[in-house]
Amino acid sequence: MAADGTIRHDWAIDEIVALHNLPLLELVGRANAVHRMHHDPNKVQKASLLSIKTGGCPENCAYCPQSAHHREVDLTRDRLMDPESVVAMAATARAAGAERFCMGAAWRQVRDGREFDAVIEMVKGVRALGMEACVTLGMLKPHQAERLAAAGLTAYNHNLDTSPEFYGQIITTRTYQDRLDTLATVRSFGIDLCCGGIIGMGETIRDRASMLHILAAMEPHPESVPINALVPVEGTPLAKRPVIAPLELVRMVATARLVMPASTVRLSAGRSNLNREAQILCLVAGANSVFYGDTLLTTPNAGIGEDAELFAAIGELDCDHVSASAA
């Protein structure tokens, strides 16, 4: 069960379960030590996330209010935004302190044509601002990944969501292998991977470890690993799931840090349910990025004012944490 900061790709699920279940202070202590080996503990990257096309997705993800299958969800569908508006919002996010701008479209897969051309222009515009650019567009083909890479895309987000074993209880319109194939396509064109999952959907601890096992077996590890806690939304199949206890998120962050020491661990959806102290504990446990802004796609997030108070409480953190690829 050694977790000494060495980059490994041979973790066993049982090893990861054992790490996750360590006494909390031991787990967080180990994770913080490993974090300091690979990262400046005073650097926390702020990322902003915008829904550039909202609702009407043909996938049936049980957690997602944007699925067309969940007709009782109160959600206004919006067509793809125009590039000028998106780049203007990126500039606003940059002025508020964000270094990374993430754009999400509720699609099953990328289609060639006017809309994809518009996304390419968005990526170019965000990069011209000196920001990292990330998109999540669903599945994509090699020639599309090539175009995104040529436009300067920093990272492509495509989450595994959960373990292979639990996956079929959450989504049936896309296979786990579909997700892995998309990740392989992205990486083959030199685009960074942003890939993580969601906890609190009814999965077991072993499911959580199994998902981390899949990620940690990738060579190299995903450059970015978002850890999300389910935000139950009325009208979705998971609407009645209880909100997870904050320390479950702390444990997941710490375990992710131990098995993927050099990756950026992003504290993502569900952060609005954490008090200031729980968020700080997540940062101590190895999270080194937060999503900044009032909403994450269509779910609530901690407000910018709250985050300003959070960082003030911590002290003078260096939040100017932009990768060299964004220069």
From Swiss-Prot:
Residues 42-268 form the Radical SAM core domain. Its cofactor is [4Fe-4S] cluster; [2Fe-2S] cluster. The keyword Transmembrane does not apply. GO terms for molecular function: 2 iron, 2 sulfur cluster binding; 4 iron, 4 sulfur cluster binding; biotin synthase activity; iron ion binding. Keywords: 2Fe-2S, 4Fe-4S, Biotin biosynthesis, Iron, Iron-sulfur, Metal-binding, S-adenosyl-L-methionine, Transferase. It holds the Pfam family Radical_SAM. [4Fe-4S] cluster binds at C57, C61, C64. Binds 1 [4Fe-4S] cluster. The cluster is coordinated with 3 cysteines and an exchangeable S-adenosyl-L-methionine. It catalyses: (4R,5S)-dethiobiotin + (sulfur carrier)-SH + 2 reduced [2Fe-2S]-[ferredoxin] + 2 S-adenosyl-L-methionine = (sulfur carrier)-H + biotin + 2 5'-deoxyadenosine + 2 L-methionine + 2 oxidized [2Fe-2S]-[ferredoxin]. SMART domains: BATS, Elp3. Its EC number is 2.8.1.6. PROSITE patterns: RADICAL_SAM (PS51918). Homodimer. Catalyzes the conversion of dethiobiotin (DTB) to biotin by the insertion of a sulfur atom into dethiobiotin via a radical-based mechanism. Belongs to the radical SAM superfamily. Biotin synthase family. This is Biotin synthase. The gene is bioB.
